[in-house]
Amino acid sequence: MTIEISAKTVKELRERTSAGMMDCKKALQECNGDFEKAVETLKQKGLVSAAKKAARVATEGIIESYIHMGGKLGILVELNCETDFVARRPEFQELAKNIAMQIAACPNVDYIKTSDIPNEIIQKEKETEMNKNDLDNKPTEIKEKIVEGRIQKRLKELSLMDQSYIRDSSILIEELIKENIAKLGENIQIRRFERFTLGEGLEKREDNFNEEVNKMLTK
């Protein structure tokens, strides 16, 4: 027996997920009217769709900027899609802005994904962990497993795609991208980003006030 689904519920699900009306109705019927289960069903189907699109070439897009802290921190990020049509859509531009804000909120993030992290960085992290005192009395096999777990955690701290989304901590940036791939129907990729901090790399002059006064008095 097919459960009766109201048009209002279908509309609410469509607004929540951006899926098509018929897809929303079908998901609600499959889940016996359970709204949250229907959301998860559509999300899973969307992620499958996103995975198929991820191999497609994305050469269009936008470069988005975000300035924070009264002009003391700036972010530039390049977000790519497949067509200029999608690049001009408000949803895509909002996504780019949110990603730029995410980068501003994550000062430890230096790479887009863990596979981008150079091997020398990984080896350095491994050496640091292997030499920690709390592992001195551990058997070699156990020690290596603990070190591997710590390294993976550290690498994720450096990776943008592994960060919890600042607007919804229940999802990662990787999941946010996949959801938007499903919503907009094109492959979307974060190609690169750059962080600018005011005065970074410059040595700030710190004058000794007493010395300055003495110099003035002796002139």
UniProtKB/Swiss-Prot annotation:
It holds the Pfam family EF_TS. The keyword Protein biosynthesis applies. The gene is tsf. One of its GO terms (molecular function) is translation elongation factor activity. The keyword Transferase does not apply. It comes from the Eukaryota. This is Elongation factor Ts, chloroplastic. Keywords: Chloroplast, Elongation factor, Plastid, Protein biosynthesis. SUPFAM superfamilies: Elongation factor Ts (EF-Ts), dimerisation domain, UBA-like. Gene3D superfamilies: 1.10.286.20, DNA helicase RuvA subunit, C-terminal domain, Elongation factor Ts, dimerisation domain. Associates with the EF-Tu.GDP complex and induces the exchange of GDP to GTP. It remains bound to the aminoacyl-tRNA.EF-Tu.GTP complex up to the GTP hydrolysis stage on the ribosome. It comes from Guillardia theta. It is found in: Plastid, Chloroplast. Belongs to the EF-Ts family. GO terms for cellular component: chloroplast; mitochondrion.
